[in-house]
């Protein structure tokens, strides 16, 4: 794991990945290295030299797009061939522009891809968006629309303009058809749903797989 310690989102993803991976493998030592860097860093040679010596099967590095692209690029220059995995912050054109051919084949998790636009709500959203904006919606756009759907559904179920009732109704969201899939909110307000896995192929983000939530 290579984490951007000044980025709370990246640190959170690294924490959840570590916990899930150790649980999945049943091996407390399955994570061979946890390396840290700061936002804005550009030279990762020291980190990567240490990682190369550990010879990992894969590297999870959920940081910002620029730093992550440089990290992957420098890893390839050092001869590290292990696959890289990241989060949705990688899904920007800048990541591909900075990383170039070196980011081909990486894997990243995100929330939306047109190939998984399987619900009627998703198909409706995709058709209307493309018609209006002449382009593909990003995962952030899809999630923003989901937030709208969740809020509207909560208001309808609350049957009131009382803010507490609306809040409680939203918190109780269960099996709501959204753009990114059927959505249920847990006790923390986080959505329980699957994740889209993408890769970079021929300089473009490409659908790879879909992982159901368990």
What is each of the regions a protein language model found here?
Residues 1-35, 58, 151:
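An alpha-beta-alpha
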Residues 1-4, 55-64, 71, 82-87, ...:
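Periplasmic-binding protein-like
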Residues 5-9, 37-42, 64-68, 89-94, ...:
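Solvent-exposed loop/turn segments at secondary-structure junctions
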Residues 10-18, 119, 123, 194:
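Short, surface-exposed alpha-helical segments at coil->helix boundaries
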Residues 33-50, 120-121:
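Structural motif
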Residues 42-49, 54-78:
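Hydrophobic alpha-helical
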Residues 72-145, 199-200, 205-213:
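Extracellular/periplasmic periplasmic-binding protein-like sensory domains
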Residues 131-141, 152-204:
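Segments of small-molecule ligand-sensing domains
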């Amino acid at each position: 794991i290579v984490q951007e310690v000044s980025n709370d989102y990246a640190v959170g993803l690294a924490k959840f990945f570590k916990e899930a991976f150790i649980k999945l493998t049943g091996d407390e030592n399955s994570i061979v290295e946890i390396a840290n860097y700061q936002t804005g860093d550009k030279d990762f040679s020291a980190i990567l030299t240490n990682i190369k010596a550990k010879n990992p099967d894969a590297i999870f590095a959920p940081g910002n797009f620029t730093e992550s692209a440089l990290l992957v690029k420098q890893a390839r220059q050092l001869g590290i061939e292990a696959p890289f995995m990241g989060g949705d912050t990688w899904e920007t054109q800048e990541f591909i522009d900075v990383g170039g051919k070196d980011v081909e084949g990486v894997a990243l998790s995100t929330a939306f891809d047109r190939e998984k636009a399987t619900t009627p709500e998703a198909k409706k959203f995709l058709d209307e968006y493309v018609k209006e904006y002449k382009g593909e919606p990003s995962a952030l756009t899809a999630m923003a629309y989901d937030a709208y759907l969740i809020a509207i559904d909560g208001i309808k179920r609350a049957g009131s303009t009382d803010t507490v009732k609306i809040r409680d109704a939203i918190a109780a969201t269960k099996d709501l058809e959204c753009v990114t899939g059927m959505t249920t909110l847990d006790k923390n307000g986080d959505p329980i749903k699957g994740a889209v896995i993408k890769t970079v192929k021929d300089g473009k983000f490409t659908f790879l797989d879909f992982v159901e939530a368990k």
